[in-house]
Amino acid sequence: MPKSKVRKKNDFTVSAVSRTPMKVKVGPSSVWFVSLFIGLMLIGLIWLMVFQLAAIGSQAPTALNWMAQLGPWNYAIAFAFMITGLLLTMRWH
């Protein structure tokens, strides 16, 4: 019976081209970005507090009458501001 040839085993080496690129380290976020997401969260909180404390009830000021007419949409608006600010914190370095 003929003998099969033994193949030479090559050592596996990673070529420089096939390596996955490393992430470039980014510096800290700018001041305007931090103030933006903190501001959005605070606007949402203030919106919710003003609606709960001042715009509901028979003694609501006439200046906040438009807010009382929005009704439950005030919760959606306030939470939209807060969630947008929260989502921006995920981009913070």
From Swiss-Prot:
Record flagged with keyword Ribosomal protein: no
Membrane-topology descriptor: Multi-pass membrane protein
Keyword Cell division: yes
Pfam families for the chain: CrgA
Keyword field: Cell cycle, Cell division, Cell membrane, Cell shape, Membrane, Transmembrane, Transmembrane helix
Domain of life assignment: Bacteria
TM spans (from-to): 31-51, 70-90
Location of the protein in the cell: Cell membrane
GO cellular component, one term: plasma membrane
Cytoplasmic side: 1-30, 91-93
InterPro entries in alphabetical order: CrgA
Ranges facing Extracellular side: 52-69
Primary subcellular site in the record, as a coarse category: membrane
Any one biological process term the GO annotation gives: regulation of cell shape
UniProt function note: Involved in cell division. Plays an important role in septal peptidoglycan synthesis and cell shape morphogenesis. May facilitate the recruitment of the peptidoglycan synthesis machinery to poles and septal zones and coordinate peptidoglycan synthesis at these sites.
Subunit relationships: Interacts with multiple cell division proteins such as FtsZ, PbpB (PBP3, FtsI), FtsQ, PBPA and CwsA.
Similarity-based family: Belongs to the CrgA family.
UniProt xrefs under HAMAP family: CrgA
Name of the protein: Cell division protein CrgA
